[in-house]
C-alpha cells in the first residue's frame, strides 16, 4: 500500500509541477493570432505560428493556415514531410503536376493527411478552411511550374 500511495503522490507532484509549463505552451482558440501568409503562398490566406520557426534553419514547426472559400495553391512539392489536419471547412487535395479539380479528394474537419517529401500536390479550399500543419523547417514551396510561384520577383 505504501508503494501505491507513493506512486499517487509522485504522479500528483509531477502534474502540479507541469501546470505552468502547460499553460505557457497551450493556446485557446481566441489566443491564436493570424497574420498575412508568406509571399510564397497566393494572396488571401492568413497564417498563425503555434510552435517553432517555420522559416528557421531547422526544427519542428506547427502552423495554422486560414484560407478563404475558393483559395487555390498550384502544384508544388516540399523537401520535408508535411502533416496536415483539417480543423474546419473542406480542404481539397490533388496529386500531380497539373491542377485538375476533377481529380481532387475533399477532406472535411477532423481529416488528417501526411505528404511525403517531394510529393507533387495541389490544394483548394471549399468554404473558409483552417488547417493545422506540422513539419520540419525551413518551409519551402517548389512550384512545379515556376510561373505559378506568387513570390514577388526581384
Language-model features, listed with the residues they occupy:
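A short, N-terminal "cap"/entry segment at the start of jelly-roll beta-barrel domains
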Residues: 20-59, 146-154
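His-enriched metal-coordination microenvironments in redox/metal-binding proteins
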Residues: 41, 54-60, 74-85
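Glycine- and acidic-residue-biased ligand/ion/polar-headgroup-sensing regions
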Residues: 68-71, 78-98
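Positively charged n-region of N-terminal signal peptides that target proteins for export
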Residues: 1-7
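Bacterial N-terminal signal peptides
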Residues: 7-18
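Double-stranded beta-helix
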Residues: 25, 102, 124-154
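Short acidic-glycine-tyrosine-enriched beta hairpin
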Residues: 53-55, 68, 97-118
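Short beta-strand His + acidic residue motifs that chelate non-heme Fe in jelly-roll/DSBH
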Residues: 73-75, 93-94, 115, 120-126
Amino acid at each position: 500500500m505504501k508503494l501505491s500511495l507513493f506512486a499517487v503522490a509522485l504522479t500528483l507532484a509531477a502534474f502540479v509541477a507541469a501546470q505552468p509549463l502547460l499553460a505557457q505552451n497551450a493556446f485557446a482558440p481566441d489566443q491564436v493570432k493570424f497574420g498575412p501568409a508568406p509571399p510564397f503562398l497566393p494572396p488571401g490566406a492568413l497564417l498563425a505560428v503555434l510552435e517553432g520557426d517555420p522559416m528557421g534553419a531547422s526544427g519542428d514547426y506547427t502552423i495554422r493556415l486560414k484560407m478563404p472559400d475558393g483559395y487555390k495553391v498550384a502544384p508544388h512539392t516540399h523537401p520535408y514531410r508535411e502533416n496536415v489536419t483539417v480543423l474546419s471547412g473542406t480542404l481539397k487535395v490533388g496529386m500531380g503536376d497539373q491542377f485538375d479539380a476533377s481529380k481532387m479528394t475533399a477532406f472535411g474537419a477532423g481529416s488528417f493527411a501526411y505528404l511525403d517529401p517531394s510529393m507533387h500536390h495541389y490544394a483548394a479550399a471549399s468554404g473558409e478552411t483552417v488547417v493545422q500543419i506540422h513539419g520540419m523547417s525551413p518551409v519551402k514551396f517548389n512550384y512545379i511550374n515556376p510561373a505559378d510561384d506568387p513570390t514577388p520577383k526581384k
